Amino acid sequence: MDFGHRLNFPTNHPLNLTDSDMIQKADLILSLDVRDLYGPLVKLDRITRKTVYITRKDCKIIDIGFADINISKWSQDFMQLQEIDLHIAADTLVAIPQLTVMCEEALNKNGKKREDIRSRFDEHKRTHEALRAGWQEEVKKNWKGEPISLPRLAHEIWQVIKNEDWVLSCNTLEDWTLGLWDFDKAYRHPGKSLGTSTQIGMSTGVALAHRGTGRLVVDIQPDGDLMFDPGTLWIGAHDQIPMLVVMYNNRAYYNDWEHQIRMAEQRGTDEKLAYLGMEINNPPPDFATIAKGMGCYGEGPITDGDKVGPALKRAIEYIKKEGKPAVVDTVTQFR
């Protein structure tokens, strides 16, 4: 299971069970370079901020990595400390091959155990395939929705870029890209995005790192994030940093809007007022025009999923010819 802080495991591998219930079922969890181990093991109530463990009471935890000796230049008094049964301070690049050899030696001494593992592999493969099939079904459910549904947008981007040597910079479109795309190389994704006003800058940095490699860097760009620093587009144009910017434009600071809805429910106040200070509408920013004003390619806004693919192809053609960012403003549903 990959928690997405960097790309650790191919998404299409039959043993990738991310988003399954394996944590709830496991009798042993091996953690590899997981800084916040507590988070994946609990369920969070977003109103009360209370957590409840989802793991079995008899589940053992082994942690391999350097998290315990991590030093921050400012502070390290954050995140919940997770109790573990065994911690091994080691570089996982060194430890995993050695652990693999040890497992092979143990299996060579016990043929029955190897058969059990093969049977378990087949079971996990079926679970993986069912997960992927379920996500594909979600794409079809709201295929014609306007604005564009997130699964549909992830699908449309994938159909255009899958034959390119691509890199996804930060935002994963609420993880729909991880469920629908084939992340098959470590450089495909440096890790999940951070908070608002960071993503356009991080994406530009990723694009700069890959400049000259022939790779197509894709930034799925939230509208609220770009509102904080649209001038970054000018940097991309000025310094000729090629990047495909596909807007995740739900015309809202919806993460906070959603939180205000939850708080209204808790406090018994009017949920209809949750939009105050949260909508990016009336009027909606014209991101295509903003992009053009910064010296980039701009197209949109697009609310029809059928028009996304052709627009992306035009943008990619511009990127390959001019070597500068291209912005396609796709308007999406909130979630």
What are these regions (language model features)?
Residues 4, 33-35, 65-67, 87, ...:
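Anionic group-transfer/hydrolysis microenvironments
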